[in-house]
Amino acid sequence: LKKPLAAGSNALAYDHKTVLAMNPLTSELSLPGWDSSYTKEGMKELLHRYESVDEEALWKNLTVFLKEVVPVAEQADVKLAIHPDDPPWSMFGLPRIVTNKENLRRLLDIVDSPYNGLTLCTGSLGVNPENDVADMLKTFAGRTPFVHLRNIKITGAQCFEESGHISVKGSLDMYRIVKTLYD
């Protein structure tokens, strides 16, 4: 959150090569949004517990969770809205599954209920140039109770920084995205 931008503000920047060079087991690793209460030993234990978890195992765990939680959400009239993985690619050997249109569809199909929904974060999904965020918004309109409008600027392969919201400041067509929401 300390990357200075030309306008004088600071933003989050992500460089996958930098992350690949980090070792969460030997350094005082901290990334934005991480639970800072983990000690080095706690982080080692956490990563050790996930060593055998691949994408399919994560899908299986998410399926069990959603099948238990969504009926309760329905009874309480609470719409769930999962946030996409940010970034939408593996880090430190940990799988990511809420990453693209196909996986969003798979997630929603686990429990076909309006209470099993998406937080459609334009930045998280938009850092992958293959993701057409406006198309995703249109496709999943009825299952998206929350939209997180965030523009990003792709600065290289798996590298990005947050940017101003208007389209010309970043890599996303924010006008098209907002127009899709409006329509």
Tell where the protein language model's regions lie, with residue ranges.
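Histidine-acidic metal/acid-base catalytic patches
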Residues: K40-R49, E56, K60-K79, W89-D183
